[in-house]
C-alpha cells in the first residue's frame, strides 16, 4: 500500500504546519505591530472575541491565553458566535474605549462579523478585524485591522492553516496585551512567539 493513497487536502495542511509555524508567527508579529496603537491597548480591560466556524473555535481556544497573560482585577474575556454576538450582546455595557471587540475571519467576508464590528463602533468600543484580507468588509468596518499574513498554500480548504493563523494571532495579542497592561513580565510576547514555533515544530 502506497502512502500517497492517503493524500488529501486536510492531511497536506496538517503536515504543512511545522513548516508554516515560523513564517506565520513572523507575519502575525508584523501585523500585530501595525494593528492597534499601544496607548489604545493599555486601556483595554474587557475583550470579546467572535467568529464563525473555525474562527469561532479559535476565539474559544484563545480565551485561556488572555486570562493567563492579561488577566487582572476587573478584567473580563469572553467569546461568542458572531450571530449571537450581533443579536444578543449589549454593547452599551461593554465599557466603551476599555472594551476590545475582535472579529476573527480569514476572508473577512461574513456579514455577521461586520455587523458585530459596526455595533462595537457605534457604542464606542475598540473594534479589531483579525483577518488575512485587508480589502475585506470586516477590515473596512473595523477601526483597526490585524493582518496575520498567512502564506499561500495550493489548497486553502479546509481551513486548518487559517485556524492555526487565527489562533497564533490571538495568542500573540494576548501576550502583548499582558505586557502593556503590566499583567505579564517584559518578554512575554517574544516568549509566546518562540513557544508557538517550537511547539508546532515538535509535532
Regions found by a protein language model. Give the residues of each.
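An N-terminal, well-structured beta->alpha segment
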Residues: 1-45
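Alpha-helical structural motif
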Residues: 6, 10, 17, 166-169, ...
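Glycine-rich phosphate-binding loops that contact phosphosugars or nucleotide phosphates
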Residues: 42-198
Amino acid at each position: 500500500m502506497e502512502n500517497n493513497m492517503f493524500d488529501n487536502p486536510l492531511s497536506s495542511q496538517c503536515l504543512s504546519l511545522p513548516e508554516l509555524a515560523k513564517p506565520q508567527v513572523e507575519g502575525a508579529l508584523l501585523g500585530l505591530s501595525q494593528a492597534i496603537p499601544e496607548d489604545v491597548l493599555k486601556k483595554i480591560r474587557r475583550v470579546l472575541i467572535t467568529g464563525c466556524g473555525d474562527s469561532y473555535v479559535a476565539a474559544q481556544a484563545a480565551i485561556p491565553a488572555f486570562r493567563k497573560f492579561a488577566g487582572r482585577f476587573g478584567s473580563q474575556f469572553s467569546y461568542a458566535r458572531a450571530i449571537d454576538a450581533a443579536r444578543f450582546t449589549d454593547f452599551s455595557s461593554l465599557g466603551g474605549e476599555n472594551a476590545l471587540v475582535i472579529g476573527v475571519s480569514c476572508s473577512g467576508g461574513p456579514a455577521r462579523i461586520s455587523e458585530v464590528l459596526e455595533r462595537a463602533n457605534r457604542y464606542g468600543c475598540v473594534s479589531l478585524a483579525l483577518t488575512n484580507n485587508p480589502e475585506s468588509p470586516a477590515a473596512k468596518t473595523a477601526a483597526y485591522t490585524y493582518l496575520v499574513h498567512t502564506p499561500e498554500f495550493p489548497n486553502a480548504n479546509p481551513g486548518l492553516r487559517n485556524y492555526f493563523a487565527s489562533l497564533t494571532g490571538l495568542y500573540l495579542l494576548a501576550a502583548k496585551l499582558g505586557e502593556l497592561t503590566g499583567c505579564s513580565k517584559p518578554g512575554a510576547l517574544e516568549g509566546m512567539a518562540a513557544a508557538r514555533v517550537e511547539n508546532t515544530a515538535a509535532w
